[in-house]
Regions:
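GGW-centered surface loops in extracellular recognition modules
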Residues: 1-33
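Chymotrypsin/trypsin-fold serine protease catalytic domain
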Residues: 105, 110-116, 121-194
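A short catalytic or substrate-binding loop motif that flags glycine-/basic-rich loops and adjacent residues
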Residues: 8-11, 37, 99-101, 263-264
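Extracellular low-complexity, Gly/Ser/Thr-rich intrinsically disordered linkers
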Residues: 186-277
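Loop/turn elements at helix/coil->beta-strand transitions in domains of secreted/extracellular proteins
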Residues: 24, 51-54, 122-127, 208, ...
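Glycine-rich strand-loop-strand elements at beta-sheet edges
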Residues: 31-111, 135-165, 208, 213-243
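Extracellular and analogous surface-interaction loops
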Residues: 14-25, 44-52, 108-121, 272-277
Length: 277
């Protein structure tokens, strides 16, 4: 380990960090993402004395479906994927694929707890949030990247007929942002389907975790395979300098070196680096 460099991974728990010496530290967070849509990135600098504790919660990747069962949401706010319908158009038993779980956010704060425990005091106790990406539905990976000041919107894809003519254009839901979303710290569960539908019997993806979690529209019937929206990020400029939150459809540094466009197909990450004494 490089002196003054600390990298934290997802352990499904809140980790405590105490600065080994007083000085200025750079904080970096990455939200979890799936194979198609990336988590966001947030960073900022803070001066710490050696007695100050920070609490880091690294978001987990949402799980893929297990047959008709929707995947579990990722640690720290990812919404569960919706279950697929178990009946076809003729009323016979048939299992349709479930949606994947939304991905968890990564955050750093001055007290312990998952992100949803900061709702009442986030302006004074929460330093950074990197939003998690939304989960996907069968054949629909949507736009649900993690935030950024705004997460990617929940989406359903355009539908074409057999001749290639556009029948139904893409449709987008409401994005999570700095002031609203599904819930503070939590993405919405994907819709569980109870009946057959053309491109609508499969479970919808869960919303990503974030300052405000992403939505997953609660619709069923034809053309309702929604990919969940991403959660929003947050950088507390009152407590940090050089603070910024960047959406997961943008190029930014990777926790493994180099650059990446969204934090894809991975749990979140957190790096704390001492930059001056």
């Amino acid at each position: 380990m490089i002196a003054g460099y600390f990298q934290l991974i997802c352990t499904q728990s809140v980790e405590e960090f105490t600065a080994p010496v007083a000085g200025e530290y750079k904080l970096q967070c990455w939200g979890a993402g799936n194979s198609q849509k990336g988590g966001g990135y947030s960073y900022g600098d803070i001066t710490l004395i050696s007695s100050i504790k920070l609490y880091v919660c690294v978001g987990g990747q949402g799980k893929n479906h297990n047959g008709y069962k929707g995947g579990l949401g990722g640690y720290n706010g990812g919404g569960k994927g919706g279950d697929g319908s178990r009946i076809n158009a003729f009323g016979n038993a048939h299992d349709y694929i479930g949606g994947s779980g939304g991905n968890g956010a990564t955050h750093i704060g001055f007290h312990t707890g998952l992100l949803n425990k900061f709702e009442s005091d986030y302006k004074t106790q929460l330093l950074l949030v990197a939003g998690g990406a939304g989960g996907f539905s069968q054949g629909n990976y949507g736009l649900g990247f993690g935030g950024g000041s705004e997460g990617g919107k929940p989406a359903r894809i355009e539908i074409y007929d057999s001749s290639g003519t556009l029948m139904i254009p893409s449709q987008y839901g409401t994005s999570a942002n700095q002031n609203s979303g599904y819930k503070f710290g939590e993405g919405q569960q994907g819709m569980t389907k109870s009946k057959h539908g053309n491109s609508g019997a499969e479970g919808s993806g869960g919303g990503g975790g974030g300052l405000y979690g992403g939505f997953s529209p609660q619709e069923e019937g034809d053309y309702t395979n929604w990919a969940g929206g991403g959660g929003s990020g947050y950088a507390n400029s009152s407590l940090l300098t050089n603070a910024m939150t960047i959406a997961g459809d943008t190029n930014f540094p990777s926790p493994y070196g180099g650059m990446e466009k969204g934090h894809l197909d991975d749990d979140g990450a957190c790096i704390v680096t001492q930059i001056s004494f």
